[in-house]
């Protein structure tokens, strides 16, 4: 493939943008090489500035569940912008979005629109702290909740030790309010609550880990956290920015049958536009300003164009059988990838929940962050580049989930698997 124009743009971008990008994973630091620059997208495909076409399994990191540039979403945006881009005042589309979310996700009796998933998680944690009068939160290894200071914390040398910041600029005093657990560790969660349960405002978790690749919860694990939170008076926050409306119409909470107190959303509810939201029990949400004393605001929150895009996308995912077909397509892809790897003599396993999947270069079923980080990253990186040369774009990191869309039909998946057979054979040589 020719990437001359992408190469020139990346060289220019590095003089103007930190690392040449506006979000770190896009720079290909994890896999090596240089990123391609996208010119347009349609259905399951991306097209770069050098006119190369890629089958896309990143999907803008999750929002494009119906494929890129879907006509219904595009038309909704075109119609909305005729009336203006931003009002800074209430609009009917905000109400329609709130009605849709509260209908599809019953645990959310009220919602507040924001501009990103990070805003949603930060606001949900502030609400939890304000509502409980407590300051500590618990998060999990491999779960990403945005770039807020409270979330950029890793576990210390022992499970119950104070948090340690993972980025310069995060005050140690703030990170000490965040405890980190291993995902799927039943005993660890119980022990930590026995130690500090009376101080915990909230547990925040991706119900399916999406930032250590894709790791589902073990049977009963989310319910175990629900029980611990209820017992100790802490709130349970599900970060469904990735899983919301993707793994099931009602999100991971519907898929696993566990009800959180608060939920955060993003990605799909914007249809590709910058949007986030958080919602939950009415008694909690009524404490958010101006109804209550817990402050949160945003100039562009509830933007009419973003609401129009999100409403159109949510209409699409409500079509009968949408999620069943999406899950079946994802299973076809994952099974085919495992078969292709096995034929080449390469150890690969996959995880899948609905239209979300993970590819791990290991013989083991991956159920924890530690297992994910123990996989063969070097071989993944070689496979990534071999697939890219075959015109298939996977997430440019071994620690990011993949996303299926309804535009990935059987022919597209067959083409992907043909490319994978070539790529695995190349890696095996």
Curated annotation (Swiss-Prot):
GO terms for cellular component: cytoplasm. GO terms for molecular function: glutamate-1-semialdehyde 2,1-aminomutase activity; pyridoxal phosphate binding; transaminase activity. One of its GO terms (biological process) is protoporphyrinogen IX biosynthetic process. SUPFAM superfamilies: PLP-dependent transferases. CDD domains: OAT_like. It catalyses: (S)-4-amino-5-oxopentanoate = 5-aminolevulinate. Keywords: Cytoplasm, Isomerase, Porphyrin biosynthesis, Pyridoxal phosphate. Gene3D superfamilies: Aspartate Aminotransferase, domain 1, Type I PLP-dependent aspartate aminotransferase-like (Major domain). It is found in: Cytoplasm. Its cofactor is pyridoxal 5'-phosphate. The modification N6-(pyridoxal phosphate)lysine is found at residue 267. Its EC number is 5.4.3.8. Disulfide bonds: none annotated. Pathway: Porphyrin-containing compound metabolism; protoporphyrin-IX biosynthesis; 5-aminolevulinate from L-glutamyl-tRNA(Glu): step 2/2. NCBIfam families: hemL (TIGR00713), PRK00062.1 (NF000818). Homodimer. Belongs to the class-III pyridoxal-phosphate-dependent aminotransferase family. HemL subfamily. HAMAP family: HemL_aminotrans_3. This is Glutamate-1-semialdehyde 2,1-aminomutase. The gene is hemL.
């Amino acid at each position: 493939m020719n990437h001359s124009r992408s190469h020139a743009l990346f060289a220019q971008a590095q003089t103007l943008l930190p690392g040449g990008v506006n979000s770190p994973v896009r720079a290909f630091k994890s896999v090596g090489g240089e990123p391609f620059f996208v010119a347009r997208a349609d259905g399951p495909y991306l097209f770069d500035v050098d006119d190369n076409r890629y089958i896309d399994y990143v999907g803008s990191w999750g929002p494009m569940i119906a494929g890129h540039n879907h006509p219904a979403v595009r038309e909704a945006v075109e119609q909305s912008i005729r009336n203006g881009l931003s009002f800074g005042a209430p609009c009917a589309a905000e109400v329609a979005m709130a009605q849709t979310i509260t209908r599809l996700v019953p645990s959310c009796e009220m919602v507040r629109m924001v501009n990103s998933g990070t805003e949603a998680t930060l606001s949900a944690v502030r609400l939890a702290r304000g509502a409980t009068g407590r300051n500590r939160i618990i998060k999990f290894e491999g779960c990403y909740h945005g770039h807020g200071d409270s979330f950029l914390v890793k576990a210390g040398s022992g499970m119950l030790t104070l948090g340690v910041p993972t980025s310069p600029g995060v005050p140690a005093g703030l990170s000490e309010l965040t405890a980190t657990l291993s995902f799927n560790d039943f005993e660890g969660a119980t022990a930590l609550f026995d130690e500090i349960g009376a101080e915990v405002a909230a547990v925040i978790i991706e119900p399916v880990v999406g930032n250590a690749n894709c790791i589902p919860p073990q049977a009963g694990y989310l319910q175990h956290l629900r029980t611990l939170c209820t017992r100790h008076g802490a709130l349970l926050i599900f970060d469904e920015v990735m899983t919301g409306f993707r793994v099931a119409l009602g999100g991971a909470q519907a898929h696993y049958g566990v009800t959180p107190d608060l939920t955060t959303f993003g990605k799909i509810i914007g249809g590709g536009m910058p949007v986030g939201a958080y919602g939950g029990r009415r008694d909690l949400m009524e404490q958010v300003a101006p109804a209550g004393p817990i402050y949160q605001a945003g100039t562009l929150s509830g933007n009419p164009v973003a609401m129009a895009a999100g409403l159109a996308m949510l209409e699409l995912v409500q079509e009968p059988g949408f999620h069943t077909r999406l899950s079946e397509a994802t299973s076809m892809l994952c099974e085919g990838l495992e078969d292709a790897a096995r034929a080449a003599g390469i150890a690969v396993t996959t995880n899948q929940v609905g239209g979300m999947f993970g590819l791990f270069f290991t013989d083991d079923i991956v159920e924890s962050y530690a297992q994910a980080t123990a996989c063969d990253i070097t071989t993944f990186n070689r496979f990534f580049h071999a697939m890219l040369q075959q015109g298939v774009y996977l997430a440019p990191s071994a620690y990011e989930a993949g996303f299926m869309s309804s535009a990935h039909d059987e022919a597209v998946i067959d083409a992907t698997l043909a490319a994978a057979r070539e790529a695995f054979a190349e890696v095996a040589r």
